[in-house]
Amino acid sequence: MQIVLFTKLFLGQPIEEVGAVASTLGFDGIDLLVRPGFHVDPSQPEAITAVVHRLGEDGLRVPMATTDLTDPAAIDTPRLFNTFAENGIRLVRLGYWKYIQSVGYAPLLETARRQLEELASLAEAAGITLAIQLHGGTIHGSGAQAAALLQGHDPRVIGVYPDPGNQTVQDGREDWRFTFDILEPWINTVGVKNGGWFPSTNAVSGQRRWHSDWLGLADGMVPWDDIVGHLVSTDFDGVLTLHSHYEVPYPQVIDQTRLDLNYIRRLIAESGASQ
């Protein structure tokens, strides 16, 4: 397993800071966010080369990138995919097919399947693999929902990215064992974060409201000790991408990220020793 750091937490920071922090903390590499306002804009894929080179100076690989891409016609997708491949980025997360109640699930699924077919053809031509992340507010928030999208797709071209933290704090909640079971042929990435729910105030109706928040990996509702044990016992050799979405001052985010990485590495070591 490779453990990489998702670069969303570095909004506004130079790429030199990304490399310095990730290498000092001990990450294997980077999950590069390709999004307007971040280090690479999807309309300017030529910037990828310089970013990958700079991170390499800190001893970091860039095995994967995260995009918002769902419609292959929205940008020059072949150019973007080919640039990823040329720079050794072989795993690319797609964007979100959002659930819109007024449209309805069936037409949304039909559109997503059509776009996925086009994306799969482009990915195969470029020699990269795509990943669909489980995420709230989408038609792929749970394992069961994602499986409906993935049926018929070659896992070497399109895979899936379970994210137990999203499933806990957002929607798509289901037994994590079921998630990993139903998606097993396609899993190439696992999102690593944790969170929980807390009682809030009552609505006028008297109904109790609840709110969620991100928590350290050892402190939330996701049983990472069990999940890591499962990944080790099944010889998972994909990517673990660690997300630090904490809404605290930047130095504190880095401190918590250090704790999270050390925790996940300890779980891997202990699970391996027990095999």
What label would you give each PLM region?
Residues 1-15:
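Boundary/entry segment of secreted carbohydrate-active catalytic domains
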Residues 3-7, 30-32, 62-67, 92-94, ...:
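Hydrophobic faces of well-ordered beta-strands that scaffold small-molecule active sites
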Residues 9-11, 34-36, 68-71, 96-100, ...:
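Active-site-proximal loop/turn and secondary-structure-junction residues that shape catalytic pockets
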Residues 16-19, 54-61, 70-162, 169:
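Active-site acidic/histidine proton-transfer and metal-coordination neighborhood
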Residues 19, 121-221, 228, 272-274:
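Acidic/histidine-rich catalytic cores of soluble enzymes
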Residues 25, 86-87, 185, 234:
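Structural motif
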Residues 31-52, 101-104:
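Glycine-rich, proline-tolerant flexible connector loops at the mouths of alpha/beta enzymes
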Residues 252-273:
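C-terminal helical cap(s) of enzyme catalytic domains, especially alpha/beta-barrels
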